[in-house]
Amino acid sequence: MVYTSILKFRVAMKKVLLLIFGFCVVLIAVAYFMEYQMGLEPCPMCIIQRIAIALTGLAALIGYFHDRWFKFYFSLTTVFSIAGAASAIRHLYLQSLPEDQVPFCGPDLGYLLDNAYFSDALRMLFIGDGNCAEVVWSLFGVSIPGWVLIWCIINICLSVSQLNPKTAFSQSN
């Protein structure tokens, strides 16, 4: 009886990890489709969001196969999703600025990584520039960072719901 309950609990948590991983795979696939098929160049903030989503998916996938330390992996997915959400919020802020307050466009990221100090390139990634303020695509009036924020919030809710064992256990029944 107890073993069956524990098994149901683990299966439910593994399903949530797999769901989070699936969300992340879809988001990364859409990002690459937009870049290579639609011709949209990712700005520095978009790259940070991609990295956060990829790390979220990687943590969920490792947690799915590891079969232990579920709280640790759900905590990791929460932290990486919060990082992606924070980057998306900053990106949305830049997009909402009036044109006269938008920061100047900086050099290309490849140029920065080749010719500037790594700390300067990293700062540019996190702060963003004028390229990040341009809305190049939207669906239902929501721009790309808006959709990233929505999916990061969903991932955060899924992860946090599994951090409380009583809540997670009641979902598995």
Region spans (language model):
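Transmembrane alpha-helical insertion/packing segments
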Residues: 2-53
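Interfacial segments of alpha-helical transmembrane regions
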Residues: 10-22, 62-85, 157, 161
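Iron-sulfur (Fe-S) cluster-binding segments and ferredoxin-like electron-carrier domains
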Residues: 47-63, 111-113
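Helix-loop junctions at the membrane-solvent interface of multi-pass transporters
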Residues: 37, 66, 94, 164-165
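A hydrophobic membrane-anchoring alpha-helix module
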Residues: 124-173
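Extracytosolic (periplasmic/ER-lumenal) interhelical loops and adjacent juxtamembrane/interface segments
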Residues: 96-140
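C-terminal TM-helix exit segments that contain a strictly Trp-centered aromatic cap at the helix terminus
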Residues: 30-35, 83-98, 114-115
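Alpha-helical transmembrane segments of multipass membrane proteins
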Residues: 29-33, 58-61, 160
